[in-house]
Swiss-Prot record:
This is S-adenosylmethionine synthase. Mg(2+) binds at D18. SUPFAM superfamilies: S-adenosylmethionine synthetase. The keyword Magnesium applies. Keywords: ATP-binding, Cytoplasm, Magnesium, Metal-binding, Nucleotide-binding, One-carbon metabolism, Potassium, Transferase.
Length: 402
């Protein structure tokens, strides 16, 4: 593994059109799981100028059964979508939460998919699809996330909080960030470049107002990155194309699942290709990605490695994973195959079956709306939210590998 290099990650804000789509899709997941913890949901969202479209497949007791919606269900779906967009802050001529056109094209789940996934008789619940899923952790930040992505997220979270509070009234919802760090000995030692492109109010692309916006962004960056990473050698690119008044879904169409690297590890780890948002936790694209992060984080938190990548693989309709792979990138204190064996010996994980994962992490709950902006990983485990960020396997792993 190289020890001296430059590495870059990007993030996008809650107002980015693809993230608007992700948040709507996950708000729908939460809505259905609040009605039926065993609901099946695959909800895709399209956002564009004054239009939101939902498409996908569902099954939910008391909401959609036998090919028909329960009374009031479609109205509740539309209300949920509009409230989600309102919370983000879109009240623009080209995209306004009160006035955009809305289309609901959700329909029933395929019976052929259901028969392969549902538990029946002596058959355990199978995986909702085939696929490979990866989890990762490293010791670059306190949350055991890649530093470049961690700081990219934090810049945008700070700006969004200031926009919502009124502290930065010139900001609009659509924003992107990018952080380049120099690493020495595998540790971040300097920020070489910071990129922030933010939608703004009228007039903030010239003169004193432009200077005010750029000074504000630099202040945010200084509050997020450690002081020893910043210097007069750090290059800033703030709205490098100039004006950015037209943004969000009015500037670019948004789709669910197009920010999978932002959602995960910022390019620092492999990705199996499956998006998370809009999917209930029987879909291993989501639940297995969460449990692999959980395992990787606990391995690093236990001091068993400085970096850890984990892969799981599944077949549709089959409950047991096809493979488990651990790679500590030469930083492990014990052999990788011994860590694999220790994981397989933890009974609480239920053999890493879809139901075992969901039961151990408590995933059959309406906890997904919060995941859909600023990353699914490196967040604080609070109450039912972000349970895959807990480090409650540390003692079990240490004991198994003593």
């Amino acid at each position: 593994m190289r020890s001296n290099y430059l590495f870059t990650s990007e993030s996008v804000s809650e107002g980015h059109p693809d993230k608007v789509a992700d948040q709507i899709s996950d708000a729908i997941v939460d809505l259905f799981l609040s009605k039926d913890p065993e609901a099946r949901i695959a909800c895709e969202t399209l956002t564009t100028t004054q239009l939101v479209v939902l498409a996908g497949e569902i099954r939910c007791k008391g909401v959609y059964e036998d090919g028909a919606w329960a009374p009031g269900a479609e109205e509740e779906i539309e209300r949920t979508v509009r409230e989600t967009v309102k919370a983000i802050g879109y009240e623009q001529d080209g995209f306004h939460w009160q006035t955009f056109r809305f289309e609901n094209n959700l329909h029933g789940q395929s019976a052929h998919i259901a028969q392969g996934v549902d538990a029946s008789g002596n058959k355990d619940e199978g995986a909702g699809d085939q696929g490979i899923m990866f989890g990762f952790a490293c010791d670059e930040t306190p949350d055991l996330m890649p530093a470049t992505l961690y700081y990219s997220h934090k810049i945008l979270e700070t700006m969004a909080a200031d926009r919502h509070s009124g502290a930065a009234p010139f900001l609009e919802p659509d924003t992107k960030s990018q952080v380049t760090l120099r690493f020495d000995g595998g540790k971040p030692v300097a920020a070489t470049a910071i990129v922030v492109s933010t939608q703004h109010g009228k007039g903030y692309d010239e003169g004193a107002k432009e200077a005010e916006l750029k000074a504000y962004v630099k202040k945010v960056v200084a509050g997020v990155l450690p002081a020893d990473l910043l210097s007069d050698q750090t290059v800033y690119h703030i709205n490098p194309t100039g004006s950015f008044e037209i943004g969000g879904p009015d500037g670019d169409a948004g789709l669910t699942g197009r920010k999978i690297i932002v959602d995960t590890y910022g390019g620092a780890a492999p990705h199996g290709g499956g998006a998370f948002s809009g999917k209930d936790p029987t879909k291993v694209d989501r639940s297995a990605a969460y449990v692999t992060r959980y395992l990787a984080k606990n391995i690093v938190a236990a001091g068993l490695a400085r970096r850890c990548t984990i892969q799981l693989a599944y077949a549709i309709g089959v409950s047991e994973p096809l493979s488990l792979y651990v790679d500590t990138h030469g930083t492990g204190t014990v052999a990788d195959d011994k860590i694999e064996a220790a994981i397989q010996g933890i009974k609480e994980l239920g053999g890493l079956t879809p139901r075992g994962i969901r039961t151990h992490l408590g995933l059959n709950k309406p906890i997904y709306r919060k995941t859909a902006a600023y990353g699914h990983f490196g967040r604080k485990a609070e109450g039912d939210h972000f349970p895959w960020e807990r480090t409650d396997l540390v003692d079990k792993l240490k004991a198994a590998l003593a």
